[in-house]
């Protein structure tokens, strides 16, 4: 199995020379053994006794072990296959009392492009297939994104985070920051959780309390454009408030597309009253995204800042390419606020170097590990050639013109009810980051 089979972000695969090595080959994680006071005598034998392989217990390194280890930037593909795969998905779906699937709009867009259908048709297809398989709800991850955007702006205005503030929604960037530039980058990373994590909290806490179901009896799967989201779901903070993960299984767009190819469904589900966040996708409604295909975080921050400003401000855009854009709120010739969209490892490295020299002068940076952002995630459906892939990126679009006011009103009602069900609900919406201390072995390999 080679790297091309699993599309981790480039920032994860090339940031460390010891990266992307299967644990069975060269894992530096020390194996635990009990200490003993028994003295051992060593003597030379002419012939070694044959070891009984059947009596030796197999050593297993879990995904969580890899994330806690300083030897690699990320875990091995074999571990991800074992813990985040179709068999794991089917197993969890079969055992659950309540099952929910969260689907990203980028995944819907990729599937729609491949099948030559409208986004709403693709949304209905995905919902029908998985509801036929046993899913109770198939929901749009953008409902969680609305919460992430709102809290990100509150944090931007009120927090004491060092400027610039970097978004913390890309697990590839977060993993890179913690393991290579922890002291430098962590004080700048937003503590607001990603849309996938927000949906995890909604499902495992809000819905669990609302429907009187224990969190461990709920199976929550997600469909994401990025394999790095499998890493995010395995992070230990997703289990801090529960006895189980908030997201039990993450499937890539390509993995879900393969499932769709194996299934067929002509059954339609009738609309039960008003379309809401729990049944929007099955009715072909996708929450729109203004400001690009990666969540629109920079756009949201600067536009809301302008709306709330007591002084009339204008927006000035500088677009260098698809991976680098600067948006400034200006009052005449004065720059009042400066935000940026930064995609791809090369641009991230440039910002790290500027930060080291205290020359990163932006207030807020929407930062993603993948070139072209989330729409180009490694888990998306791949084209046969580079030319087709470029055409795909130019063609795939997310809904951006529809009014989200109805969904935003629903979110406010959910927040109000959630606060009654769990007075500490806000604690579930933020996270913390930890710099991983490198071992001596890793320092040697890094400086090799």
Curated annotation (Swiss-Prot):
Q: What does this protein do?
A: Component of the cytosolic iron-sulfur (Fe/S) protein assembly machinery. Required for maturation of extramitochondrial Fe/S proteins.
Which keywords does the record carry? 4Fe-4S, Iron, Iron-sulfur, Metal-binding
Q: Which GO terms describe its molecular function?
A: 4 iron, 4 sulfur cluster binding; metal ion binding
Q: Which family does it belong to?
A: Belongs to the NARF family.
By its UniProt entry, which InterPro entries does this protein fall under? Cytosolic_Fe-S_CAF (IPR050340), Fe_hydrogenase (IPR009016), Fe_hydrogenase_lsu_C (IPR004108)
Q: Keyword Metal-binding: yes or no?
A: yes
Mind listing the GO biological process terms from this record? iron-sulfur cluster assembly
Residue positions binding [4Fe-4S] cluster 1 = 27, 66, 69, 72
Protein name, per record:
Probable cytosolic Fe-S cluster assembly factor Bm6838
Q: Which organism is it from?
A: Brugia malayi
Question: What residues does [4Fe-4S] cluster 2 bind to?
Answer: 170, 226, 370, 374
